[in-house]
Amino acid sequence: MAGEPDDVDTMVEPVVPSRHRWLAGLLGAGPGDRVADLGCGTGGTLAQAAPAVPGGLVAGLDLSAGALARTAEAVAGAVAGQDRPPGALLVQADLKDPLSLATAGFDRVLCHNVLEVLPDHDALVAEAVRVLRPDGRLVLAHSDFDTLIFASEDLELTRRLVRAYCDTQQPWMDAVDGTIGRRLAEIAGRAGLQVTDVQAQVVLGRRYLPGEIGWGYARNLADTLLGAGRADEAELDRWMAGLQRLHDRGAFLFSVNDSAVICGRMPR
C-alpha cells in the first residue's frame, strides 16, 4: 500500500472491542488451529482469537511496524498464563504483493477493512485462498463507509461530508472503494469460493470524546476532506462544534455498518 498513518494511535479500529469479538466469532477457530489476519492493524481481532487456539498459531500481516508492535503486545496479553499459548507470527508486508505464507497453511483466514484500499481486490483474495487449507474458512469483512451516520445539527452538510469522505482516497491508500462492504459476496464468487453465510453488525458510538469511535471517524473525515480540498476549514469546524454540542446534551450518535461473508472452497 502507498503508506500507513504515521501514528497508529489515530486509528479507530482498536477502540471497538465489540467489532473484534464479532470477527473472532465468525472465524470460529479452535484448539490447534492456525489463524491468519491479513491487515491485522493493532491486533484487536487476533487478541480475541488467540485464547481459543491453544497449541496453534496466530499470524498477523500489516504494513505498519508500529501496528505490529501493538499486535504483539495485545496477543501476549490475551494469552498470558495460558498453559499452551499459540505461537505468534507477525510479518510486515505490503498486501499488494504475494503473501509470504505457506500454501494451505491456515485453518482460518481473515481480511478485514483492507480490500477497499487495494487496486486489485481479486489478487489478495486469491492469495488468501492459496494459504487456506482445503477445509478452512475465509472471512472477508468490511465497513461500508456510505452507511456512516452522525447525529447532526446540519443534516445536509453531514450527508455531503459523508459522501465525499466515502469517495476520497487518503494519502496512505492505493485505491478507494468506500461501498465495497456491500459487494463482498460478489468478490468471493469471482474467486470461486462458496459463500456459506453473510453477516452484518452495526458499530455504535454514543460519545464524542477522544478515543471513541465517533470522534475518531469525525476527525479522520475532517482531516481527509481538508487535505483533499473537498471541504473548507470553517464548515468542518462548524460541523464538529455541532457534534460536540450534541454530545454535551447527551444526543450524539454515530454508527457504521460492517458486513462479512464466510467462505470456503467449493466442494469437488
Show which residues each predicted segment covers.
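Class I SAM-dependent methyltransferase Rossmann-like catalytic core
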Residues: 1-17
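C-terminal helical/coil "lid" or tail adjacent to the Rossmann-like core of SAM-dependent
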Residues: 2-7, 196-254
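Class I SAM-dependent methyltransferase SAM/SAH-binding core
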Residues: 36, 42-98
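A short SAM/SAH-binding and catalytic strip from SAM-dependent methyltransferases
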Residues: 107-121
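A short glycine-rich, Lys/Arg-flanked "PGG" loop and its adjoining helix->strand segment in the class I
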Residues: 122-134
